[in-house]
């Protein structure tokens, strides 16, 4: 399929309504007020707060001071900032940058992304030579933190153009707002032409559309805006329309009784059958973060105002629902253990009719007295008690988790380090499923065997989300400990995609080498620790209007 646009659009917009840094602290109820002109603050000094605050309790977003860097304020030479700014840079850093630049993809001479893996030793390329939206996020953050925003801008514009394509799976037409899972650039050396082929799920295993792609696109658009201070891109009619199309898919009215998004298996990073159908924590956390990012970037004009109103209402409902019903700590586990069932009334405590006998044995030993996490899934008569790393880390970054809940997640990580981190950060989920349950849940998937791939495998890319969460909660020592583990093996093992085993000791049996997001995740984690102000790109302060939920009383059986 030939790419419809010969050159990237030249986009301009008149004026701006408010700076993004001001919008992040936005009181949701004020979103409905008449817009007023505010001064754009493009730079903020990082020396207003002591760096020692990062190791004392929960850190406020404004303490980290989200700097909006001017594109010209950083050198564009090939020597990365993470090397230049460190007195004794780890030798892995320079080699990681070299590998990351090798993975860059060009369309008509312009960089538009990075391929999933640069593993020439692998016999089967499959789709690892494509640019995946979710995979490019850590690469994009690395380039932004290094003062190289052009590739990120090109990626945002190119995927925005792909969103406008007609999307079909067999004879069924997908929603207009669906973002591609990936795209591939084909170079014709004879005709000297470049062609883009996009995949919206029609070629994916299981033929599932990527629900997370649109959310990552919105989050990355905000990260670009925060990093560069350039508001013009997000305010263009094209980007405004792109956001509205994505939001239309997930804010439409239907038969839902919950504010969470109903999803199929395989619609996110866990892109194979793993029992995450329903309301998976990863999608709900990304949904929440994308809504907040969109709220800070949508114009309150005739078309945007309706979306702003719907976002405000959905955020209030979603935050209450997630904090009330997805949160699990020692007390809540004890309450569920004592639940009555078959309650019929508005006063029911066990609102989802969760059967206490369905609580798996492992969770009683796993749950410490101090600590907690958002469970994997909640739906009628079903609660998935598994820990999912990405969903919990994004919950911290988006402030879906309250400050107390964020600290509890960090406490759990420290208490259960051997189980959740082991010898290689970070378990994608815990625990694995095996035996008869594995056969039923995965359909006997040979790739998702116990402690492998998505079934309890260890994924180095998750290091960047862990590091960001550690910095936001004032626990950078946890991130340093994880980075030390990464630096002891990742380069020696040729940057694999994932590790296998209960402790994450073995390179994954089907893991690709030189996996780009493993490389980029390491670089982003290193740069955030060196300059914690970078966290402003991918972190949001808690909104004061979304009050922490009051603890519910237990359903007593006596």
From Swiss-Prot:
GO molecular function: beta-fructofuranosidase activity; endo-alpha-N-acetylgalactosaminidase activity
Phosphoserine modifications at: 16, 19, 50, 555
A Pfam family reported for this protein in Swiss-Prot or TrEMBL: Glyco_hydro_100
Phosphothreonine: modified positions: 79
InterPro entries: 6-hairpin_glycosidase_sf, 6hp_glycosidase-like_sf, Glyco_hydro_100
Gene3D superfamilies hit by this protein: 1.50.10.10
Known catalytic reactions: Hydrolysis of terminal non-reducing beta-D-fructofuranoside residues in beta-D-fructofuranosides
Keywords: Carbohydrate metabolism, Cytoplasm, Glycosidase, Hydrolase, Phosphoprotein
Role noted for this protein: Cytosolic invertase that may cleave sucrose into glucose and fructose, and that is involved in the regulation of root growth. May regulate sugar-mediated root development by controlling sucrose catabolism in root cells.
Name the record gives this protein: Alkaline/neutral invertase CINV2
Originating organism: Arabidopsis thaliana
